[in-house]
Swiss-Prot record:
GO molecular function, one term: MAP-kinase scaffold activity
UniProt main location, coarse: membrane
Membrane-crossing segments per the record: 31-51, 63-83, 89-106, 121-141
Protein name: High osmolarity signaling protein SHO1
Organism listed in the record: Vanderwaltozyma polyspora (strain ATCC 22028 / DSM 70294 / BCRC 21397 / CBS 2163 / NBRC 10782 / NRRL Y-8283 / UCD 57-17)
Membrane disposition: Multi-pass membrane protein
InterPro entries in the cross-refs: SH3-like_dom_sf, SH3_domain, Sho1_SH3
Cellular component per GO, a single term: cellular bud neck
Record gene name: SHO1
Length: 358
């Protein structure tokens, strides 16, 4: 069913990120302001040389006029997109549009570069510069923000490294897997408890006897069925495994850390609850925090509220001083003045000297 105009208007007016015009968005990005400035200068040179060449008696390639007009339109659109901070929304358009402009300019350069006269030489120099800039734009805007070249270029921007849609999608996918895994743990706990209860009832064990869920065990440390009752009837083992089950149900995110492949994900008496994790190592974002030093100092540019679904993030206020141990990647490991340790987004803070934070 096609929605009415009123419903469509209500959908458009729904909750979404609103972007306001700000020239600082363009000026604060060295890559954007430099490439756009060079393109505008090259465009003026091309236009002047083309007008001067068209007054000569010699023929002038007419298709070049359309390339000049198209390049001017592309420059105007890019300035608007940057001023409204819509670059991440239109990266595909900018990349494809720059590719088309690259073809137009290289075609014009082929027709002008071998022509005689200083006027056509100026026009050919302008279209060659435009072709180079367009090729750089295709390479930059065609790549993800997490690519090495984009991260290096964005590191000079006042806004910092832009968030990566690919990495964000990967994190959301892992969080959905975390929720599914926690539900599977709860279902497995209930099934094994019911199975063990049925076994005890079948063997004539008192119904009021405390039983142990196998979720907290490896399930393979005792393969002798004759010794099952002696292990399960231990009061210490009952209490320990009940606590493990409660901890897994209350903290499914922490439980997921120990559920990766080729890693023992169950708690035993010998491990004492200390298991390894590989999901954080794979992402490069989440890892166990030890007693490592924090040699860098950073000041919060904006306030940040940690995600409740991610136990590794920490919140901070604007202007707060943080100690940082690793400045590689989009998430940095940091330590607050209160001693709280966690990860923070790098584009919300600015590195400073130690004496500046005093």
């Amino acid at each position: 069913m096609i929605p009415s105009r009123a419903n469509a208007k209500a959908r458009r007016a729904g909750h979404h990120v609103r972007h306001s015009f700000g020239i600082s968005n363009l000026v604060g990005d060295p890559f954007a302001i430099s490439t756009i400035s060079i393109s505008m200068i090259s465009w003026v040179i091309t236009l002047g040389g083309s007008i001067a060449s068209a007054t000569d008696r010699e023929s002038f390639p007419r298709f070049t006029w359309w390339g000049i007009a198209y390049q001017a339109l592309l420059l105007f659109i890019m300035i608007v997109i940057y001023c409204y901070d819509l670059v991440d929304y239109y990266k595909g358009f900018i990349s494809s549009g720059s590719g088309v402009a690259f073809i137009y300019n290289t075609n014009s350069a082929t027709n002008l570069v071998y022509s005689n006269g200083a006027r056509k030489a100026a026009a050919s120099a302008g279209v060659i510069l435009l072709s180079v800039i367009n090729l750089i734009w295709v390479f930059y805007y065609g790549g993800d923000n997490a690519s090495p070249t984009n991260r290096w270029i964005d590191s000079f921007s006042l806004r910092g490294i832009r968030p990566s849609a690919y990495e964000d999608a990967l994190i959301r996918s892992l969080r959905r897997r975390s929720a599914v895994h926690s539900r599977n743990l709860q279902n497995a706990a209930l099934e094994r408890e019911n199975l063990h209860l049925s076994t005890n009832l079948y063997n004539g064990v008192d119904q009021n006897q405390n039983y142990v869920s196998a979720v907290g065990l490896t399930g393979f440390e005792n393969t002798n069925p004759n010794s099952t009752n002696s292990n399960f009837n231990s009061p210490y083992r009952d209490q320990q495994n009940d606590e493990v089950i409660s901890m897994q149900i209350r903290n499914p995110t922490d439980t997921l850390k120990t559920s990766n492949e080729n890693v023992n994900t169950f708690v035993t008496e010998s491990s004492n609850g200390n298991t390894e994790t590989t999901m954080g190592d794979t992402l490069g974002l989440y890892s166990e925090f030890g007693d490592e030093s924090f040699p860098y100092t950073a000041r919060a540019l904006y306030s940040y509220q940690a995600d409740d679904a991610d136990g590794y993030e920490v919140s901070f206020e604007q202007g707060e001083i943080l100690k940082v141990s690793d400045i590689e990647g989009r998430w940095w490991k940091s330590k607050k003045e209160t001693g709280e340790v966690g990860i923070i987004p790098s584009n919300y803070v600015q590195l400073i000297e130690d004496d500046e934070g005093i």
